[in-house]
Swiss-Prot record:
SUPFAM superfamilies referenced in this protein's UniProt entry, alphabetically: VC0467-like (SSF143456)
HAMAP family found in the cross-reference section: UPF0301
NCBIfam families given in the database record: PRK00228.1-1 (NF001266), PRK00228.1-2 (NF001267)
Protein's recorded name: UPF0301 protein Bxeno_A0649
Family: Belongs to the UPF0301 (AlgH) family.
Cellular component, GO, one term: cytosol
Matches recorded under InterPro entries: AlgH-like
Record-linked PANTHER family: UNCHARACTERIZED PROTEIN YQGE (PTHR30327), UPF0301 PROTEIN YQGE (PTHR30327:SF1)
Length: 192
């Protein structure tokens, strides 16, 4: 079998950090994988809100946000890579995509251009979105290695967990997709 036919693609999957996660940056996280290929992987942590809200962030980038329900929506820590850059995970846009959008096959869209934020500020943006600062990134083979060492569980992503479940409940909700709860997980890997 060739390498291209036996490799898995985890795009549009949740990565759920196991209790024995070696990197404390990802302890207790759920990551939505936007892209996974032989070159590496890119994802956004969806359950780690920051102290920054949309009103504060929009003010920093000279955008006026006056939509009351959005003012105090938290901005999330998306991962340790490019933490000064915004990444917006949202439902696919009808018609033309935003300037820098990546469509996730079978899933959502991720946009990095300011036009999506301008649309949010004007009330014409995506109805459901999650804004992160930074992203999680893995080089070629790095994520697969972490999974093989029991660092992550994987499960097909459910957009309802991204947008409709409170941040503090997303880890348990993602685990429930696998039929397990957090108390069932151990930091020890089994060996035969």
């Amino acid at each position: 079998m060739s390498k291209s036919t036996d490799r898995i693609n985890l795009t549009n999957q949740f990565l759920i950090a196991m209790p024995n996660m070696a990197d404390p940056t990802f302890s207790g996280t759920v990551v939505y994988l936007c892209d996974h290929s032989e070159r590496g992987a890119l994802g956004l942590v969806i359950n780690r809100p920051t102290d920054i809200d949309l009103q504060a962030l929009f003010s920093r980038i000279d955008l006026k946000l006056e939509i009351e329900p959005l003012l105090h929506v938290p901005v999330y820590f998306g991962g340790p890579v490019q933490t000064e850059r915004g990444f917006v995970l949202h439902d696919p846009k009808d018609g033309n995509a935003y300037t820098s959008s990546m469509s996730v096959p079978g899933g959502l869209e991720m946009t990095t251009s300011k036009d999506v934020l301008e649309a949010v500020a004007s009330g014409t943006g995506p109805e459901r979105f999650l804004l992160t600062l930074g992203h999680a990134g893995w080089g070629a083979g790095q994520l697969e290695e972490e999974i093989s060492k029991n660092g992550w569980l994987t499960v097909e992503a459910d957009p309802k967990i991204v947008f409709d479940v409170p941040a503090e409940e997303r880890l348990e909700a993602a685990l429930a997709l696998l039929g397990i709860n957090l108390s069932m997980l151990s930091g020890e890997a089994g060996h035969a």
